Every structure is written in C-alpha cells, then in structure tokens.
C-alpha cells in the first residue's frame, strides 16, 4: 500500500534481513497486514493487535526464513492467518504455497487475502495435519509455532519430497522437544535468526527428507 506509514519500516527490515523483494511486494505485504489488522478486530486471528508489532513479529519474522525455502512448492502447516505462507508467497511469486489449517474462519480470511492480492498460486487445505493426504509431496514443509516437534516432524517428512526440507520456526531452542523425538530425527540443522524489531530468541530447525518420502511411495 503506497504511502502507508509502515512502508519505510518494512523496507528497512527487509534490507536488514539481506533480502530483495520483487516489485510491488512491499506494498502487497502492507496491504496484507492491514487486512489482518482489520479482520483481527472481529475474528481474533492474532494475539498481536498493534500494526507496528505485527510488521516485525509477523511479516519480518516470516520473511526471515525465505533463504531456507527449497524448490517451487511449500506447505504451511497450521497456517492460521497465513503466516509464514502468505509473506513467502508475496516475496517469491513463483512459489506455490498451500495453507493447511483445520480452522475454517482463518481459511476464510486467507482466501479473502488471496482474492484481494491476486495470489493465484496460493492453495488451501482445511484438515488436520495427520489426516492430510495431498496428491504430490512438497519441496518445503514449514510450521511456525504450530505444535510440539514430536507431533510435527514425522508427519511433515511424510509430506515432503525426497531431498526436500522440513522447517520448524521456534522461539527459544526447544531442547526438550528435540530430546522427545525418535533418535533418528534428532539430527537437524539449527539456525539462530536475527529478526529486526524482535527482541526474543528465534530459531529455525531444518530436516532433510530421506531418499524416498512416504507420499512418493504411495504415488509412484
């Protein structure tokens, strides 16, 4: 949204992240934020109410993982209001993003965002993670504070193509959650994220899917 007072802060944050956005993406991100702000008053989509705080803790936090997204298809598990999936879709127009969430109210919001912003590569799936059976595996599967790792990682690997990436966005390093995983799944890559305007710790955990995923076995 041109002329929005939050636009300079977004540009500064994106620069600090070392990213370059395609033309029009910054304005579209602000439009998305304003839609979230407006819908949030009635539908309680986010506990964060202040738009400036939303910019840092939602938009920039989501964009911070852009360099770690692999391939052309991404599944956002427990996407809620579309985070991180919608910011990633706006920042990388060639990316096909599927938003998976069991909450119909939140899916109605994200569908409206897709309509208003012309996000034709955005897909929607209303289901629980354990019940979701896509036709094809994804290049990247991501969750943002969705659930404990033990309930996420095995299912995410099932939905990821061979050699693809499973990403989990967390605050503090979840040592207890990692310890609760089967031994074969504890070997992940840990990355500390420096998100502009976010004081607390942010971590990205990355797993590489094995040679043949469960979805590929079921759909040879």
Curated annotation (Swiss-Prot):
Q: What class of enzyme is it?
A: transferase
Span-the-membrane segments of this chain are none
- PANTHER family associated with the record: S-ADENOSYL-L-METHIONINE-DEPENDENT METHYLTRANSFERASES SUPERFAMILY PROTEIN (PTHR31760:SF0)
Q: Which Pfam families match?
A: GidB
Do you know which InterPro entries this protein is assigned to?
Answer: rRNA_ssu_MeTfrase_G, SAM-dependent_MTases_sf
Q: Which family does it belong to?
A: Belongs to the methyltransferase superfamily. RNA methyltransferase RsmG family.
Main localisation: cytoplasm
Q: What is the lineage of its organism?
A: Bacteria, Pseudomonadati, Pseudomonadota, Gammaproteobacteria, Chromatiales
Native source organism of the sequence: Alkalilimnicola ehrlichii (strain ATCC BAA-1101 / DSM 17681 / MLHE-1)
Can you say where in the cell this protein is located? Cytoplasm
Q: Which domain of life is it from?
A: Bacteria
Q: What is its EC number?
A: 2.1.1.170
This chain belongs to the protein called: Ribosomal RNA small subunit methyltransferase G
Query: What keywords are assigned to this protein?
Result: Cytoplasm, Methyltransferase, rRNA processing, S-adenosyl-L-methionine, Transferase
Q: Give me the reactions it catalyses.
A: guanosine(527) in 16S rRNA + S-adenosyl-L-methionine = N(7)-methylguanosine(527) in 16S rRNA + S-adenosyl-L-homocysteine
